[in-house]
Amino acid sequence: MSVKGITPQELAAYGIHNVSEIVYNPSYDLLFEEETKPTLEGYERGTLTTTGAIAVDTGIFTGRSPKDKYIVRDAITQDTVWWADQGKGKNDNKPLSQEIWNHLKGLVTEQLSGKRLFVVDTFCGANADTRLQVRFITEVAWQAHFVKNMFIRPSDEELARFEPDFIVMNGAKCTNPQWKEQGLNSENFVAFNLTERMQLIGGTWYGGEMKKGMFSMMNYLLPLKGIASMHCSANVGEKGDVAIFFGLSGTGKTTLSTDPKRKLIGDDEHGWDDDGVFNFEGGCYAKTIKLSEEAEPDIYHAIKRDALLENVVVLADGTVDFNDGSKTENTRVSYPIYHIDNIVKPVSKAGHATKVIFLTADAFGVLPPVSRLTANQTQYHFLSGFTAKLAGTERGVTEPTPTFSACFGAAFLSLHPTQYAEVLVKRMQAVGAQAYLVNTGWNGTGKRISIKDTRAIIDAILNGEIDKAETFTLPIFDLAVPMALPGVNPDILDPRDTYADKAQWQEKAEDLAKRFATNFDKYTDTPAGAALVSAGPKI
């Protein structure tokens, strides 16, 4: 079956004219040639490294630009989007008028017109019933490479009948000179129009804007259909038992979901529908700062031909210095998921989840290493999305910094957070799934809970041992904590026992409880949020 490709007339329908050539769904070999052409300049040019992967730079934008994110406010989105200018919660969903959208679209289409363009047709979502068919249009070869890595690659048969549901036009080279008069944040923009089903990118070269842009759109579309949309990793055991892992950066989400006894469904973005849990993506976007073969062999070995490195330091001989964070600490690599051996094949999906794990790294030394949550506590801790970091390594500086990120991914939520919590718990209740709060952080000893103990805790959750254990109730937080677990140091299960003076735990617990309550206040502007206050800590 022949792949139909795309015509200049189709691009003209988006406002792109006089295209000199269309490179449609290029192969990896062609992309390799295109992005290493000696005539390329600036951020377009890729560098071949000794790993076999190409390295590119994204300029001053080495991460997402949340302050430059906009959504057109119209009849469709007015009463559904969680707007930045409404309610108590802070978020990045700033409203944009149709008039300014038209102006931004004109800038991007003018930038892409008359050029040689790469068009990549992909799927977002591994379940054929609910996936988005996404068309990416860019003039930059490595950006086409990035989306080929990160999204699901259709077969020739699927491409022959491909009809896009969503268009992403990446005009990284263009900026908006009228931003001040229009009341925008800067000359750069990442804008969405849910009526036109389109994303526009201008001014930023960061590849992650395309990945997370479509995640934000799935986060809008799926929950409205009753499908959970989740910022999590997921894996499946030999018996088909599925576990999902939520957690902010530094909590161990990638490490703990990578398990030789279980197959990886995906590492970052998933949906949960009537058939089960499915990956949105066809690749992984892993951090590479201080990467080593010993610590993370799967990621290390995935960096080879067809992988794409971002903002790493490449030495004169082509070797990569993964320890050098001089460009950014957010160095990344994208690669197709099949670069990892132990994955679910041929489609990144599995059955319903039976275990839901919330990972937190509590630097306050208050939370137990593991607790079993009720349905309301599940919603409360999901909405809280808590973790904490130690403030610094200087002597005597021990005040932790708390982070609360709704649904463990506030930056990507398009609807009010309570809608995600409600859908998740409905999915869990339909199949009898159980949630657990796992603390990978610190306790009263001042040391971090060992990876050995944490892995044994995860094993006890996955094999069901934790559900047989006797529990006690931890005061203030009202959490059900096991009294003993196989392979876990019994002295750490009650966090109070890790303090020489238990009054210290009480004092810290009351402090942390107040922080939880202060954070949760923003959800009380909806009936669903107000009803969950009693599931939180009590002072």
UniProtKB/Swiss-Prot annotation:
Its main location: cytoplasm. PROSITE patterns: PEPCK_ATP. Disulfide bonds: none annotated. GO terms for cellular component: cytosol. Substrate binds at residues 64, 206, 212, 332. Keywords: ATP-binding, Cytoplasm, Decarboxylase, Gluconeogenesis, Lyase, Manganese, Metal-binding, Nucleotide-binding. Coiled coil: none annotated. Mn(2+) binds at residues 212, 231, 268. It is found in: Cytoplasm. The keyword Acetylation does not apply. Pathway: Carbohydrate biosynthesis; gluconeogenesis. GO terms for molecular function: ATP binding; metal ion binding; phosphoenolpyruvate carboxykinase (ATP) activity. Its cofactor is Mn(2+). Binds 1 Mn(2+) ion per subunit. ATP binds at residues 212, 231, 247-255, 296, 332, 448-449, 454. InterPro entries: PEP_carboxykinase_ATP, PEP_carboxykinase_C, PEP_carboxykinase_N, PEPCK_ATP_CS. Its EC number is 4.1.1.49. It catalyses: oxaloacetate + ATP = phosphoenolpyruvate + ADP + CO2. PANTHER family: PHOSPHOENOLPYRUVATE CARBOXYKINASE (ATP), PHOSPHOENOLPYRUVATE CARBOXYKINASE ATP. HAMAP family: PEPCK_ATP (MF_00453). Monomer. Involved in the gluconeogenesis. Catalyzes the conversion of oxaloacetate (OAA) to phosphoenolpyruvate (PEP) through direct phosphoryl transfer between the nucleoside triphosphate and OAA. This is Phosphoenolpyruvate carboxykinase (ATP). It comes from Yersinia pestis. The lineage of its organism: Bacteria, Pseudomonadati, Pseudomonadota, Gammaproteobacteria, Enterobacterales.
